[in-house]
Amino acid sequence: MVLGEDSHEEAASAPAPAAVAAEIDDAPSAYNVEMMESIVQRLRPEDRHQIRDMISERGRMSGALGIACFLFWWVAVHMGGDSLGDSDLPASLIGDFSYYHLSLVVPGVTLVATILLTMGREKGQSLTSNAGGVLAVMALFLVVEPIGRMALLGDLDTQTALTASGRLVIIAALIHLATKMMVDSILLEWVRGFMMSSDIDVLPERQDPIIEGHADEAPPLV
């Protein structure tokens, strides 16, 4: 009788398999926790309120840099390309792109390269980082190609080559910064949402400075 009662009590107190499975599914994985710690360590938010402010600030900066890149391309390439002699520039060695199409390819390649490099670093994926590095070098080659043609082939004068490469540098830099801000904002939003839904905290503990008063000081020697 005692053994039967003990077995019934153990069966009643034992958790149901479905409840255990649900608890395991709801628990954050070590991969997600490590990724959140990597993001927090890189961006260094002090608390959850600062995470919210950083999301808003980076989203705003991403939009501002993105529209600045578009306006610069519109004025310097789309509208002013003919006056700067873009139609006389030779086609690119890679893809046989004209300068107008090159001004669209460079920001596209830069955008994808920035996303791959950022996600490869945060996730610790070598293939993603490898692909991002390949695209980054390709974008750099397309940007400096006019200067290289001037120095090696001699089919461009100095002013034309510097003007062509300079515009591509500005476009690539603006789109890189805009994409980086956008990805950081999305990652911070993911960290904030995961912390709120999973009730975990990956933020570093704040250490208040220790203020020593005069009472703690040793008396002077007489």
Report residues per predicted region.
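Low-complexity, proline/glycine- and charge-rich juxtamembrane/linker segments of membrane proteins
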Residues: I200-V222
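Transmembrane alpha-helix entry/boundary detector in multi-pass membrane proteins
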Residues: R60-A64, S83-V109, T128-F141, A161-I171
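Cytoplasmic juxtamembrane regions at transmembrane-helix boundaries
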Residues: G120-E145, V202-E205, P209-I210
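N-terminal, intrinsically disordered, low-complexity segments
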Residues: M1-D47, P219-V222
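Canonical alpha-helical transmembrane segments
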Residues: L104-Q125
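Alpha-helical membrane-associated segments of multi-pass integral membrane proteins
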Residues: S56-V77, E145-D208
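Cytosolic juxtamembrane helix and N-cap/initiation of the first transmembrane helix
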Residues: I24-A76
